Amino acid sequence: MARTVIARQYGGIPDLEVADLPSIPLEPGRVRIAVKAAAVNPADLKRLRGEFGRNEKSLPLRLGSEVSGVVTEVSPDAVGPAGAIAVGDEVVGYPVSGGFAAELIAKAESVLPKPPGLGWPEAAGLLLGAVTAFHLVEVAGIAAGDRVIVHGATGAVGSAALQLARLRGAEVFGTVREGREAAVTAFGAVPVPYGPGLEQRLRALLPEGADAALDTVGSDEALDASVALVHDRNRVVTVAGFARAAELGIRLLGSGPGADPGTELRANARLPMLQLAGEGKLIGPPVIEFPLDRVQEALTLVAGGHAGGKVVLLP
C-alpha cells in the first residue's frame, strides 16, 4: 500500500484526500520510485478543475508531474534518457503522472539522474520551470550582448529564464514585486518594479529599447510594455496571457490555443538543465515544504499566485 493524494471527482481543493492505494505490478518500460519530494504547480490545479479535459473513467484523479526519489524496481527493458536505470538510483521524474504519493510508477523516458549536490525538494521542483525557461530563451534567440526584459523574474520560470539569459551573456532587466528586488540582483540582473508606469521605468533604463522580452506573467502591463520596447515582435515570447498576446502578435509557448508546445525541445533540455543545476549554475527558487497530508494547504498557497517559492510535498 502507498499513501497517495487522490480526488474522486473533478472539482476543487476540498476534493483532495490522502488514501492508501495498493501497489501494482510494473509494465514494460516502467520504473518504480519511492518518492522523496513532489513539486506542486498551477497545472495541478487546472487538472483538478478539469481544465485540461475530463475523463470520468480515469477517476480517482491523481496529481503531480515532478518528483525526486529512489528507484526501487525496474522492468527489464527500462532505459532512461541518460542510459540504464538501476535499483537504488537517486532520480528526478519529469514529466510523470500521480507524483503526489509515497510511491510512483513512471515511464523510463521520464526518469533522469538527480545531481548529487541537489537536495530532494530542490530536485523535485527544478525541471518544469527550467525547461519552460529554456524554451523561452531558445525561441527568443537570446545571445551575448542582448538587452532582455524578463517579466516575473522571481518566479520558478522567470528566475530560470533570467539565469539562462545571463549565462548566454545577455544584459537582463527583471520585473518584480516591490520587496523582491534582491532575488533579481543576486543573479546579476537589474530589478524593475511592477505597477503603473512600468513601460516608462523600463524605457528610462533602456532608452534605445530592448532586443527581446520573455514573459511569464501575461498581464496587459507586461505585454504592452514588451511590445513598446522590443523592435522585433518575433523576439517577444510568452507562456501566459494568451488572449492578449494573440491580439498583439506575440509568440505563444506552451499548451494554450495556437501555442508552440516545444515538446521535443523541452524533453531534450532536461539533462542539460540538471547538469547546470548540479554545477551550481542554475539555482531554483526557495522551497516551501508541506507534508503530504497537508496537500490542501499546499495547493491553496499555489492557487494564491504569490507563494514566494516552489511548493513541495514530502510523502
For each predicted feature, which ranges?
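NAD(P)H dinucleotide-binding glycine-rich loop of Rossmann-like/cofactor-binding domains
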Residues: 46, 65, 78, 90-152
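N-terminal Rossmann-like NAD(P) cofactor-binding module of classical short-chain dehydrogenase/reductase
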Residues: 92, 213-214, 237
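Mid-domain Rossmann-like dinucleotide-binding core that forms the NAD(H)/NADP(H) cofactor-binding site
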Residues: 130-195
